[in-house]
């Protein structure tokens, strides 16, 4: 019985750690910085928002913060190569917010809509670099 308890403790610890590995849309700057690594550039935008480019492992993470919360995130490879389907799925899942993502095939570029209609994603070439962009959809209530 002790082995089973130890195994369960290890599994629980791994899942708890993994829940903090990925930051996502709406997270604060501290969590994003802990997850996305070294800051390469930081710019204050005209509207008061802040754009930050991070580098960690083989990825660039570009994030726009408004009121200290992430309102747009872009993911790309440092080498400028395409993200794999697995990588795209992983980034979308990190930004699911409890919802699911589905392809939106009404456009020439690859688009994804979140099932709760609170965010959208596009995978397109930006400045010569294949990039996944995730942003909230602002709906009126």
Question: Which role fits each region the language model picked out?
Answer:
Residues 20-31:
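Cleaved targeting-peptide boundary
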Residues 7-19:
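Bacterial N-terminal signal peptides
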Residues 6-7, 141:
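Intrinsic disorder/low-complexity segments enriched in polar/small residues
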